[in-house]
């Protein structure tokens, strides 16, 4: 069955939830192939992204997980005649969590640990809508000109904030045009306060993966592509700092039903559902101080990032997860074949991967287990990390580079790991288990040697070993 992926996987309306529930209860769904990223390659004239479902009518309950595959282009000549499947494009969704609306988007771009982090954020912090209600704020989208059937002179001469020239944090009224028209479709009759100072104005589309907002201390109007919030200026500045953080972008990359599926903007309802920590007076003052500095230096956002991560009480490994999604997932979506995801890793990247996979395995198996590592890298398309199982050790990663014989071996191995069927280009990563060694063989591309990749590989190694012990 081929159908729109948005309705099947990402919409959260009651109608869509009922359809998904009936689909899974009335049939044995074996696999779902989410073709959203391939929309432009496979369906030139499609009005929306598609998904394919492989299923049989239900005769008896089955317990095996649903295979969920999200193939993604590799932006080479192979994309013209085939579609590509990477090992990270395939996951197995346990049937006891298929009713979780979040799983399909997170599994599309993230990893199991991202589901944990998103769940932690949602369970720990109330949505922005609650923050807005508790602080008696007023929200709405701006006016809409549309069919221009209604005449209204209320906005004439007021500063006009426009999405196309939106400036983050603050813009002087002298820099803005003024309203010189009086024809509208919608004039925001019931929430006019959003145009009154002080107000926070949020741009619903992002710029380079970040969402922009500004707090103005003068009255101004704007159209429906911008959101307005009227309230106390300290709380508005706090929200602006949170909205500008990588955490805000990370959350919506992995939960929003439109972004990285078909459109590059958020709907108002999605923004209001963002988990927001409740600040105390000291934290409000700190946010205002950071905001005021950003007005003069909008690119100096390291203080903003540190503040936001402290507010969300993130641990170091959770910060790595967030950075990986922005630096690699979003960068892949934006820059395609020019993405840093496809570039060769630095030795420091390999060392971070090694330290991370070693740390996860040591914590999982206990402090009695120790690992050292040998890394084989060269000019070949593959890199090999050998984990030596031994007593606890503080040895650094041993790096072996540019051996002609090694390069030849890795080139031949790379060819053997590609399943080159007529219409499918599938690549397999390789793990080999020996009594005292674990071989991890993967392409020499940065996306395979990140912190998040290390956590995923370590979890799968533990699962493989646990199955062997049974």
Model-derived features with residue positions:
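Flexible loop/turn segments at secondary-structure boundaries
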Residues: 8-12, 39-42, 62, 167-170, ...
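Short, solvent-exposed loop/turn and secondary-structure capping segments
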Residues: 12-15, 172, 253-255
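Signature of N6-adenine DNA methyltransferases within the class I
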Residues: 1-147, 221-226, 264-272
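Generic recognition of stable, solvent-exposed alpha-helical segments in well-folded globular domains
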Residues: 3-4, 11-14, 18, 24-27, ...
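Basic, amphipathic alpha-helical recognition segments used for DNA target recognition
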Residues: 60-62, 193, 224-273, 280-286, ...
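Short helix/loop capping segments that flank catalytic or ligand/cofactor-binding pockets
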Residues: 63-64, 169-172, 210-214, 237-239, ...
């Amino acid at each position: 069955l081929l159908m729109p992926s948005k309705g099947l996987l990402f919409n959260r309306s009651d109608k869509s939830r009922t359809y998904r529930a009936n689909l899974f209860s009335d049939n044995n769904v074996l696999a779902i192939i989410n073709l959203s990223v391939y929309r432009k390659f496979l369906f030139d004239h499609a009005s929306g992204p598609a998904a394919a479902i492989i299923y049989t009518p239900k005769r008896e309950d089955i317990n095996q997980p649903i295979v969920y595959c999200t193939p993604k282009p590799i932006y080479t000549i192979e994309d013209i005649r085939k579609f590509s499947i990477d090992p990270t494009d395939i996951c197995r969704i346990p049937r006891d969590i298929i009713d979780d609306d979040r799983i399909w988007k997170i599994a599309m771009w993230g990893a199991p640990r991202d589901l944990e982090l998103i769940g932690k954020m949602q369970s720990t912090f109330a949505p922005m809508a609650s923050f807005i209600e508790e602080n008696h704020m007023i929200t709405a989208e701006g006016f809409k000109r549309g069919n221009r059937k209604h005449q209204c002179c209320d906005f004439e001469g007021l500063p006009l904030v426009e999405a196309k020239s939106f400036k983050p944090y603050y813009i002087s009224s002298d820099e803005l045009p003024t309203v010189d028209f009086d024809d509208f479709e919608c004039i925001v009759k019931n929430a006019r306060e959003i145009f009154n100072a002080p107000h926070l104005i949020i741009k619903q589309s992002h710029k380079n993966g970040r969402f922009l907002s500004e707090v103005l201390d003068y009255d101004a109007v704007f159209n429906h592509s911008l959101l307005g919030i009227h309230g106390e200026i300290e709380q508005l500045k706090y929200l602006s700092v949170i909205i500008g953080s990588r955490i805000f972008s990370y959350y919506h990359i992995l939960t929003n039903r439109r972004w990285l599926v078909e459109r590059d903007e958020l709907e108002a309802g999605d923004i209001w559902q963002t988990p927001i920590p409740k600040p105390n007076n000291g934290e409000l003052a700190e946010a205002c101080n950071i905001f005021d500095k950003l007005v003069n230096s909008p690119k100096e956002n390291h203080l903003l990032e540190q503040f936001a991560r402290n507010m969300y009480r993130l641990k170091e490994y959770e910060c790595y997860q967030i950075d990986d999604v922005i630096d690699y997932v979003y960068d892949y979506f934006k820059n395609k074949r020019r993405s840093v995801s496809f570039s060769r890793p630095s030795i420091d990247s390999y060392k971070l991967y090694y330290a991370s996979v070693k740390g996860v395995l040591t914590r999982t198996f206990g402090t009695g287990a120790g690992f050292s590592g040998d890394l084989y890298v060269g000019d070949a398309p593959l890199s090999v990390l050998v984990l030596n199982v031994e007593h606890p050790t503080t040895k650094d990663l041993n790096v072996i580079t540019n051996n002609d014989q090694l390069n030849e071996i890795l080139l031949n191995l790379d060819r053997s790991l590609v399943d080159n069927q007529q219409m499918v280009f599938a690549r397999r990563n390789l793990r080999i288990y020996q009594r005292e060694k674990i071989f991890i063989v993967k392409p020499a591309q940065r996306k395979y040697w990140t912190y998040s990749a290390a956590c995923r590989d370590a979890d799968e190694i533990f699962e493989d070993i646990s199955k062997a012990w049974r």
